[in-house]
Amino acid sequence: FRLRPEFVDKFTQTDIDGGDDGDKRCKFFTNGQSKDISSMTTETAGYLSEKWSNQKDDKTTASNTADAGVETDFPLFRLADVYLMYAECVVRTVKDKKEWDDWAGGSDAESDSRKQGAIYWINKVRERSKASDVWASNFADDDAFLQFILDERARELYHEGYRRTDL
């Protein structure tokens, strides 16, 4: 699959280059490829996704015969999806509650505590992929936090059939 440049931009150059410091979810084939897709008929236009490859754990190619089929496993429901859904629900709920509290003269303490819980689960997802932790101070407001969660869903769940629903 070719990846749109807008999606590639959700990762840093360190992630794309690989190595120990990069986000391990960034599985792009970039050798000889340009990031931009200038033409659909040019094979080298656009990075390619290696997320779903027909390789065994030892990196040898698995069978792909008419009788055996492809040996690529794929998840039906992932725990990372649950964690990110929870975080999104918290932020949306906190945002609505803050608007109510502002109108009614309430407190932000409970909302801040719930957001810390959401950040904990986001960081559990990021920990698995060796991405750095995020903190509440990374986000100017709830809208920025919500956008980060949607971008994190894109980074974590790409090519799993969720993105269209997320949009």
Feature-to-residue mapping (PLM):
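Polar, glycine-rich mid-to-C-terminal structural blocks
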Residues: 1-9
